């Protein structure tokens, strides 16, 4: 801490607040030492302790009076925030009453961050409904009529997210067919929703070559068309 602050001061920057990441609480002696050597008030040395859940962090920083100290530095009023909704959310997260397992079927499942927005949305939905959401990552290329039973035997829902390109498309369509025929809750996002239309057209209506023009320009049943502003 002292070395990094000294480097900042060497560039003419004097920090007003220091937030210290720590696994254990900082005692007053440590805070006083940081205050002395970094040239700022002791009550501007705050601790940011490890938490079990990311969403607890704002609550812990409020306990450290971070907002109050920031407003003091900026000469602003600092009314007490109403964090009751946030506290309820964290309580739901810490005390779930049920659990679901959702199969996320994609072609980049080895790189979980590729679907981070979907993962976080599932987590948020779980928090709201007092439910732990476990994600089963499924490589779309492994899904076939022969493997589907084994892959999806233990899931309570199937999600096919957005994507592009041909690879894995038939596996996604098979996952969608399995969800429909086994009455498993399904959500298709972007390409996932388009492929749900393709699957229904093929297996229910009987348009066996139904497809998206983006993926198969020669299909005789183009149930998904490219928007005019996407045509090169």
Feature roles, as predicted:
Residues 1-232:
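N-terminal beta1-alpha1 cap of cysteine-dependent amidohydrolase-like domains
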């Amino acid at each position: 801490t002292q070395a990094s602050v000294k480097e900042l001061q060497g560039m003419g920057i004097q920090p007003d607040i220091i937030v210290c990441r720590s696994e254990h609480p900082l005692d007053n002696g440590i805070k006083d030492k940081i205050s002395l050597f970094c040239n700022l008030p002791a009550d501007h040395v705050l601790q940011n302790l490890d938490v079990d859940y990311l969403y607890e962090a704002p609550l812990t920083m409020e306990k450290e009076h971070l907002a109050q100290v920031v407003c003091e530095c900026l000469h602003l009023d600092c009314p007490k925030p109403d964090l009751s909704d946030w506290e309820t959310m964290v309580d739901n997260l810490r005390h779930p009453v049920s659990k679901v397992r959702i199969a996320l079927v994609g072609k980049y499942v080895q790189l979980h961050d590729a679907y981070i927005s979907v993962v976080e949305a599932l987590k948020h939905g779980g928090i709201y409904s007092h439910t732990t959401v476990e994600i089963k990552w499924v490589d779309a290329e492994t899904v076939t009529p022969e493997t589907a039973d084994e892959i999806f035997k233990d899931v309570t829902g199937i999600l096919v997210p957005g994507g592009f390109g041909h690879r894995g498309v038939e596996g996604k369509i098979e996952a969608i067919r399995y969800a429909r025929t086994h009455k498993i809750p399904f959500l298709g996002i972007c390409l996932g929703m388009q492929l749900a239309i393709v699957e229904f057209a093929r297996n229910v209506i009987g348009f066996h070559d139904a497809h998206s023009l983006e993926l198969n320009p020669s299909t005789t049943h183009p149930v998904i068309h490219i928007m005019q502003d996407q045509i090169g």
